[in-house]
Amino acid sequence: MLQRIYLDNNATTRIDPKVKEIMDPFLRDHYGNPSSLHQFGTETHPAIAEALDKLYKGINARDIDDVIITSCATESNNWVLKGVYFDECLKKGKNHIITTVAEHPAVRSTCNFLESLGVEVTYLPINEHGSITADQVKEAITEKTALVSVMWANNETGLIFPIEEIGAICKEKGVLFHTDAVQAIGKIPVDVLKANVDFLSFSAHKFHGPKGIGGLYIRSGVGLTPLFHGGEHMNGRRSGTLNVPYIVGMGEAMKLAVEHLDYEKEVVGKLRDKLEEALLKIPDVMVVGDRVHRVPNTTLISVRGIEGEAMLWDLNRSNIAASTGSACASEDLEANPVMVAIGASKELAHTAIRLSLSRFNTEAEIDKTIEVFSQAAVRLRNISSSY
């Protein structure tokens, strides 16, 4: 069987064997409902508490109760935006939300929905580097602004947004601040207190944990109307039977992610740079976005004259997994939205390929990818009508 190379880690990651190992007893033996009063339920409580401890420490939250378990970051993002709509827009008349054009569809689409309910949403444009400035946020805030929602790191370019500066502005202005940290956790340090964040969304499967489990940090003292009703789970904030094995797995994945931050920077970052430098030797290849202020595992490459989907399938035939952008929208085959937002032509925006590494990738895999990608570029350009 040919070697398979996985370079789509911004879409999802393989589960760490240590995570799988710690989850296994709760799938086989300790399967009781944590809300039950008998021993099958109560024996799960220490493991849940330990997992929550790992989670809140991993993002430097103030208290273990500040982290609420959800099914994924999409739920967390929806909860924040819709909860703020109920708490701030309807009850207090603060009918304005600020976000960016570069957000994940889980934020953008929810904002579109809120617009249909009468909420005014400002979508801040990104500059030619793929980022925004804190001053843009400051200038957009009005007396009616209820929430600012800006991702910590972009899922396509890997660009890191100025979260600490934005957090300071929001604190000064008395505006709630939410960040989608899905692409930041496990790649760079995330500190909710230092960043003055009120809400932070994350998802375990993006840092080598299981799919179907995520979390929402809610700063102590900040209220948020529940999205789900029907139980008193998570101190009455999020109804639904606790998914014990996945909570345990997510906690361990967070612990391992924090422990590997230096490895991400020193080893994964160097592998990404090696891949990038080799591909830039191909004529008419460019890296999209700022190459300095970004997470260490991600590169968004544009190969002029080659449709991103064509390159994607050519790589796939060689057992190399990559992406043309967000996996949540990859079946749409639309032009890369970040490239469109920075002003690239629609034709050029269709040429984007995202390569995202993890701590499980090897140098041999990168060497093989360079070889296959370079050969594919020549072959596809020979049959391209636009090059």
Swiss-Prot record:
CC terms in the record's Gene Ontology section: L-cysteine desulfurase complex
Cellular localisation: Cytoplasm
Cofactor(s) named in the record: pyridoxal 5'-phosphate
Sequence positions bearing N6-(pyridoxal phosphate)lysine: K206
Annotated positions binding [2Fe-2S] cluster: C328
GO biological process entries: [2Fe-2S] cluster assembly; cysteine metabolic process
Residues annotated as catalytic: C328
Gene Ontology MF annotations: 2 iron, 2 sulfur cluster binding; cysteine desulfurase activity; metal ion binding; pyridoxal phosphate binding
Reaction equations catalysed: (sulfur carrier)-H + L-cysteine = (sulfur carrier)-SH + L-alanine
Pathway membership: Cofactor biosynthesis; iron-sulfur cluster biosynthesis
Function of the molecule: Master enzyme that delivers sulfur to a number of partners involved in Fe-S cluster assembly, tRNA modification or cofactor biosynthesis. Catalyzes the removal of elemental sulfur atoms from cysteine to produce alanine. Functions as a sulfur delivery protein for Fe-S cluster synthesis onto IscU, an Fe-S scaffold assembly protein, as well as other S acceptor proteins.
Subunit structure: Homodimer. Forms a heterotetramer with IscU, interacts with other sulfur acceptors.
UniProt cross-references to NCBIfam families, sorted A to Z: nifS_epsilon
Full protein name: Cysteine desulfurase IscS
